[in-house]
Each structure stands twice: as structure tokens, then as C-alpha cells.
């Protein structure tokens, strides 16, 4: 199947009851398992590779393996670098044919905008997509603390999108990486407000591993079929 971009795979999801899942892979076994599961369920997926994992596995090894598997799959699969902060490395990934998430959420707003916009311009010249993030989850992917959680405001989301032109926007609405300590407290109303303000712009959430299915269903019922 022809390679698809992150933007295409999210824009192509018109089913209000379906979430597009994104799953981190670490090696060939993860790649094969994800492709087999996607084909079995006949559903498009996003294959994510953490920046540190890809630096270790190398673009010309792990990256090429992921791209090759996606292209030969029987369902649409987008390949993207997850939570990247190294702009030079991310540009190499874009050159190789991957989409990227540039995560400048820990930076001051203006710097996040400037860095993300630079990545967007570079990616669009190559027909690739960029996901940006505004707001912080409070917990890193490895479970370490990343400071206080900062929920994305509607104004921040709109301003960030208008100034960067990102293809996909990741937001913070109570979601965290890994397991929750107690009940997950997802601000569904904030998602409503951001979605209404941004219209057709794909809005995604990271840290979906421990979000209860009832909350995922609630998001889908409101039209948020695009979630990571």
C-alpha cells in the first residue's frame, strides 16, 4: 500500500466512533506485531518511534524497517518520530520519509512556536507532516517527572496553530504518559472547546495507555476520532 502521511491517516478517519491508535515500536518484533494486528483488525494505525529509540536503532536500520513494513502493509500505516527535540536529527528523519512530532512544549511559548514553525516549513517542502504540542503532560514517557502539568487553553491552541501551521496538534487535557495514580481526570469539556475552535485541524492526545474506554468513547461521540 502506498505510504501515507500522519495528516492523511487522521484526515481519512471519518468514522465518529473510531479512534486512530498510535503505538510505539522498539524493534522488529514490535513492527511485525503492530502490522499484523492492524491488518487483522483492518484498521489504519500510526507507528511511532521515540527519538531516543531511533537514535539507538538508527534511521537506516530501524527507521527503514518501519517504513518498509508500512509500505508493504495491507492497511494504511503512517510512520512518525515521537517526542523529538533534536531539530537536526528530525530533519534527517524527514529526509528519510518519516513524519515527526516536534515537542517544544517544555520551551517558552514563543520559542516553541519558532522551532515548530521551522520544522513545519522543512517538512512541507518534502511532502511530510509535523505534529506540534502545546501544554505539558507532567510525566515523561519513561515515567520521570517533567514539572507541573499545564493544560492547553483554547487561546494557546488557536494561536499556536495559526503561527506554526502544524498538521496535527497534541494537547494536554489531563492525559499523562503511563499509568494514572488514581482516577483519570480528562477534561472532556476542554477538548470540546479546542475542537470547536480549530475546526478540521486534527487534535490528538498522548498517554492513552491507561485512559478508560468510557472516556475514549465519550471523545469519539463528540467527534474526536483522532487520538494517540
Task: Give the location of each predicted region.
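Alpha/beta enzyme core
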Residues: 4-16, 26-52, 60-76, 84-202, ...
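Conserved residues at beta->alpha junctions
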Residues: 24-25, 207
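Cofactor-binding active-site loop characterized by glycine-rich and histidine/acidic residues
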Residues: 56
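Conserved acidic functional residues
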Residues: 80-83, 206
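Short acidic/histidine-rich active-site segments
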Residues: 207-210, 228
Amino acid at each position: 500500500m502506498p505510504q501515507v502521511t500522519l495528516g492523511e491517516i487522521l484526515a481519512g478517519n471519518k468514522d465518529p466512533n473510531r479512534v486512530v491508535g498510535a503505538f510505539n515500536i522498539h524493534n522488529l518484533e514490535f513492527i511485525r506485531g503492530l502490522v499484523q494486528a492492524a491488518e487483522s483488525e483492518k484498521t489504519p494505525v500510526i507507528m511511532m518511534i521515540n527519538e531516543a529509540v531511533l537514535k539507538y536503532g538508527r534511521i537506516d536500520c530501524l527507521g527503514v524497517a518501519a517504513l518498509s513494513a508500512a509500505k508493504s502493509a495491507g492497511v494504511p500505516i503512517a510512520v512518525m518520530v515521537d517526542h523529538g527535540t533534536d531539530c537536526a536529527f528530525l530533519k534527517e528523519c524527514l529526509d528519510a520519509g518519516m513524519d515527526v512530532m516536534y515537542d517544544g512544549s517544555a520551551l517558552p511559548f514563543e520559542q516553541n512556536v519558532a522551532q515548530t514553525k521551522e520544522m513545519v516549513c522543512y517538512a512541507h517542502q518534502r511532502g511530510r507532516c509535523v505534529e506540534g504540542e502545546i501544554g505539558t503532560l507532567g510525566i515523561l514517557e519513561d515515567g520521570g517527572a517533567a514539572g507541573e502539568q499545564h493544560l492547553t487553553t483554547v487561546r494557546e491552541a488557536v494561536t499556536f496553530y495559526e503561527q506554526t501551521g502544524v498538521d496535527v496538534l497534541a494537547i494536554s487535557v489531563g492525559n499523562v504518559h503511563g499509568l494514572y495514580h488514581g482516577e483519570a481526570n480528562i477534561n472532556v469539556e476542554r477538548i470540546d472547546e479546542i475542537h470547536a475552535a480549530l475546526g478540521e485541524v486534527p487534535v490528538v492526545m498522548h498517554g492513552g495507555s491507561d485512559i478508560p474506554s468510557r472516556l475514549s468513547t465519550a471523545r469519539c461521540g463528540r467527534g474526536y476520532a483522532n487520538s494517540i
